Amino acid sequence: MTKIIFMGTPAFSATVLEGLLTDERYDIVAVVTQPDRAVGRKKEIRMTPVKELALAHELPIYQPEKLSGSEEMAQLISLGADGIVTAAYGQFLPSKLLDSMDFAVNVHASLLPKYRGGAPIHYAIINGDAEAGVTIMEMVKEMDAGDMVSQKALPILDQDNVGTMFEKLAVLGRDLLLETLPAYIAGEIKPVPQDASQVTFSPNISPEEERLDWNKSGRDIFNQIRGMYPWPVAHTLLNGKRFKIYEGDLVEGQGQAGHIIEKTKKSLVVATGQGAISLKSVQPEGKPRMAIADFLNGVGRNLEVGDVFGQ
C-alpha cells in the first residue's frame, strides 16, 4: 500500500481526496489544508472542505499558516510517506519536503502549460476558450512548472460557469489521477516537459477585473459574468452604487453601450459594444441577491429605457 500525504483546500481538492480514499492501493497518512478562516459578513470561522472530509474519515490533519520551516513540516517528513498528492492546496511546497518523497504530483485544473496559477478555470471561461481540462504534473519549486504526467480535456459550454466547471474538472481530475498514478509510481510513464513558449498565467482575479466594461462585446461580457460566477461575481455601477451581476444571457440588441434598451416586468436588457445582455440574477448594493423580476418589481421599478449602467 502506497503511503500518501494529501494537500488541498477547496471542494475541488476534496473530490480528489475522496477518490484516493476509495482506492485500497493508497493509505492517506496525513492531510494538509489551509487554516480555518473567517468568512462572510458575520466573519464566521469556517473549516475547509478538505478538513471536513478528513475529519469524517478520522485522518490526521495539519493546518500550518506557512508550511516552510514549520514544526508541521518536520512532522510530515517523519511520517515516512512514499509521496505527496496536492490539489489546489494554496501554498508552495518547500524543496526539503519534496526531496524527502519518492514522488510528488499535483492535480492542476488547466491544460498546462496554459494557465499556471490560482484561477485557471476563471480565465478559461473569461477568455472564451472552447475547452478546459486537468493536468497531473510533477511538483517542482516553480509554480505549476513541473513535467506533465497526464492530461485530459473537456468542452466549456455556454451554460457553464466557474461553479459547474469546478465540479466537472474535480471529477475529471480525480478519475485521471486514479487512472494515472499506479503506472506513474511503477515508472511506466515518462513525464513530458512543458513547452516554455506556450506558458500563460492565471493569477487570482483582481478587484479591477471584476468590473464590467459595457463597451466590450456582449460575448466578452457574457464570458466575464460566467467566469466570475459564483465567485468573485462581476459588478458594475448603477446610479453610482455597486451593482453585482450573477447571471445574464447573451441576446441580440443594439444601443449605446451600458444603456438599458428593453425593460418589461420580468426582463432587463442592457446594450454592449456589440449585442446585448439580458440580466437574470443581480444584487443591488445593500440588498440580497435576487432574480431580475424581483428587482424590477422592487428597488428597480423606476428604471427606464435609456438609463445607464457603469456610472
UniProtKB/Swiss-Prot annotation:
S-S bonds: none
Record SUPFAM superfamilies: FMT C-terminal domain-like (SSF50486), Formyltransferase (SSF53328)
Keywords: Protein biosynthesis, Transferase
EC number: 2.1.2.9
Single Gene Ontology MF annotation: methionyl-tRNA formyltransferase activity
Annotated signal peptide: none
A Pfam match: Formyl_trans_N
GO cellular component, one term: cytosol
Catalytic activity, as annotated: L-methionyl-tRNA(fMet) + (6R)-10-formyltetrahydrofolate = N-formyl-L-methionyl-tRNA(fMet) + (6S)-5,6,7,8-tetrahydrofolate + H(+)
EC category: transferase
KW Nuclease (keyword) present: no
Keyword Transferase: yes
Chain sites annotated for binding (6S)-5,6,7,8-tetrahydrofolate: 110-113
PANTHER family linked: METHIONYL-TRNA FORMYLTRANSFERASE, METHIONYL-TRNA FORMYLTRANSFERASE, MITOCHONDRIAL
Family from the record: Belongs to the Fmt family.
Function of the molecule: Attaches a formyl group to the free amino group of methionyl-tRNA(fMet). The formyl group appears to play a dual role in the initiator identity of N-formylmethionyl-tRNA by promoting its recognition by IF2 and preventing the misappropriation of this tRNA by the elongation apparatus.
Identification of the protein by name: Methionyl-tRNA formyltransferase
Gene name linked to the record: fmt
